Amino acid sequence: MSEVLPYGDEKLSPYGDGGDVGQIFSCRLQDTNNFFGAGQSKRPPKLGQIGRSKRVVIEDDRIDDVLKTMTDKAPPGV
């Protein structure tokens, strides 16, 4: 998991004129490779691969009945 750490003591700068005001400091993320998740590390598809889909297996016992009733009925307005 990423840790948020300050840049260093030389990067710290006081904020405001009063001594009772806190300090604002910059911070950075360590190990940002996994920050956006695994999906970001994929390469974009090649031009010939755009629009091609993988085969999908439908595991529904009723799909044959549903598809049959859809083809038997005429769409409304036709």
UniProtKB/Swiss-Prot annotation:
Xref: Pfam families: CaM-KIIN (PF15170)
Gene Ontology molecular function, alphabetical: calcium-dependent protein kinase inhibitor activity; protein kinase binding; protein kinase inhibitor activity
UniProt KW keywords: Cell projection, Protein kinase inhibitor, Synapse
Region (CAMK2 inhibitory domain), start-end ranges: 41-68
GO cellular component: dendrite; neuronal cell body; postsynaptic density; synapse
Residues making up the signal peptide according to the UniProt record: none
Effect in UniProt of substituting residue 58 to S: Slightly phosphorylated
Record-level GO BP terms: chemical synaptic transmission; long-term memory; positive regulation of inflammatory response; positive regulation of insulin secretion involved in cellular response to glucose stimulus; positive regulation of systemic arterial blood pressure
InterPro entries from the UniProt entry: Camk2n
Disruption phenotype: Knockout in a spontaneously hypertensive rat model results in decreased blood pressure and vascular reactivity to N-omega-Nitro-L-arginine methyl ester hydrochloride. Increased renal and serum endothelial nitric oxide synthase and serum nitrate levels. Reduced fasting plasma glucose concentrations and a 23% decrease in visceral and brown adipose tissue relative mass, resulting from a decrease in adipocyte number.
Expression by tissue: Brain specific. Highly expressed in frontal cortex, hippocampus, olfactory bulb, caudate-putamen and cerebellum (at protein level).
Subcellular location: Synapse; Cell projection, Dendrite; Postsynaptic density
Function: Potent and specific inhibitor of CaM-kinase II (CAMK2). Plays a role in the maintenance of long-term retrieval-induced memory in response to contextual fear. Modulates blood pressure and vascular reactivity via regulation of CAMK2 activity in addition to regulation of left ventricular mass. Mediates the NLRP3 inflammasome in cardiomyocytes via acting as an inhibitor of the MAPK14/p38 and MAPK8/JNK pathways, thereby regulating ventricular remodeling and cardiac rhythm post-myocardial infarction.
Family: Belongs to the CAMK2N family.
Alphabetical list of PANTHER family matching this protein: CALCIUM/CALMODULIN-DEPENDENT PROTEIN KINASE II INHIBITOR 2, CALCIUM_CALMODULIN-DEPENDENT PROTEIN KINASE II INHIBITOR 1
Subunit text: Interacts with CAMK2B; the presence of Ca(2+)/calmodulin increases the interaction but is not essential. Interacts with CAMK2A; this interaction requires CAMK2A activation by Ca(2+).
Protein name (Swiss-Prot/TrEMBL): Calcium/calmodulin-dependent protein kinase II inhibitor 1
Record lineage: Eukaryota, Metazoa, Chordata, Craniata, Vertebrata
